[in-house]
């Protein structure tokens, strides 16, 4: 079946290999880091030893070290096959949020709010929607994530653009001039990992570039986070909100009728699994 192009809304070989690498990596590293403890068979205090059906348990490969090597080898082989195929086809992130119709598009941003993901090679599986069977992905991103805010500690976990952690740059509140502190959202986004600076919403940003479905009660321009409103659809519970999935066209923001696609699995995970 090699050479046949399958719709990536269905299970395919590359997806199966990715899942194989994920499971094998988990199993191998779990055995490796919990070796000798009660969390793995035959470890100190392992409760399975007291069960008649497990009293003489032996690993299929002979011992735990062989088992670890088996799973890690399988993870490496499966992830390498996918990684080699897609390493030159990952979606580019310009780091910029499109703010006007004549601004350059950011393919990475669009990958999470497009209606058809078949043009993104790294997306190995995605879910398609229609207006009759829709979602509220784009609408939630346009609002305050419907009362599910991210925490300050979550934001602080993102590295700086140069790969250094935030805590090496002065205080969390004030920074050192490279890390700008967190007095404002604009400061938080400055010189950060491009995924944070792209997806963390900032007051004053344009949320809707094309208003093809006017008359909706949308945030065309991102407001100051409203943390006291009682309407959970518009509530910003922490002051930090994400725009991932936030389509720039209002036609995708009709309640219960949005049809931006949902990314399920991406080939980039295979590269990460292989490196690990």
Label each region the model flagged:
Residues 10-14, 24-226:
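An aromatic- and glycine-enriched ligand-binding surface/loop that stacks and positions planar moieties
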Residues 19, 78, 195, 273-274:
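Short, hydrophobic/aromatic alpha-helical segments in well-folded domains
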Residues 4-7, 60-68, 257-261, 274-276:
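Second-shell loop/turn segments in exported
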Residues 217, 222-266:
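Active-site beta-strand/loop architecture of penicillin-binding DD-peptidases
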Residues 1-5, 89-94, 252:
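Glycine- and aromatic-rich loop/turn segments at beta-sheet edges
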């Amino acid at each position: 079946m090699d050479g046949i192009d399958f719709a990536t809304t269905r299970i395919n070989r590359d997806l199966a290999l990715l899942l194989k690498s994920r499971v094998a990596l988990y199993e191998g590293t779990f055995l490796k880091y919990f070796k000798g403890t009660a969390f793995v068979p035959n470890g100190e205090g392992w409760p399975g030893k007291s069960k008649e059906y497990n009293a003489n348990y032996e690993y299929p490969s002979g011992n735990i070290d062989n088992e670890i090597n088996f799973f890690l080898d399988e993870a490496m082989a499966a992830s390498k096959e996918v990684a080699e195929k897609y390493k030159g086809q990952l979606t580019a992130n310009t780091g910029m949020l499109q703010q006007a119709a004549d601004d350059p598009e950011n393919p990475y941003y669009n990958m999470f709010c497009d209606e058809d993901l078949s043009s993104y090679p790294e997306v190995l599986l995605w879910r398609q929607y229609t207006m009759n069977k829709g979602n509220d992905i784009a609408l939630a991103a346009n609002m305050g994530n419907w009362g599910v805010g991210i925490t300050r500690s979550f934001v602080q976990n993102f590295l700086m653009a140069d790969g250094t952690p935030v805590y090496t740059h002065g205080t969390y509140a004030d920074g050192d001039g490279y890390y700008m502190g967190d007095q404002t959202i604009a400061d938080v986004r400055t010189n950060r990992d491009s995924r944070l600076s792209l997806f963390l919403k900032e007051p004053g940003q344009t949320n809707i570039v094309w208003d093809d479905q006017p008359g909706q009660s949308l945030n065309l321009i991102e407001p100051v986070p409203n943390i006291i409103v009682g309407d959970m659809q518009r509530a910003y519970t922490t002051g930090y909100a994400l725009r991932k999935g936030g389509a720039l066209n209002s036609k995708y923001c009709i309640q219960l009728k949005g049809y931006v696609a949902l990314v399920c699995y991406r080939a980039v995970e295979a590269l990460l699994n292989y490196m690990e």
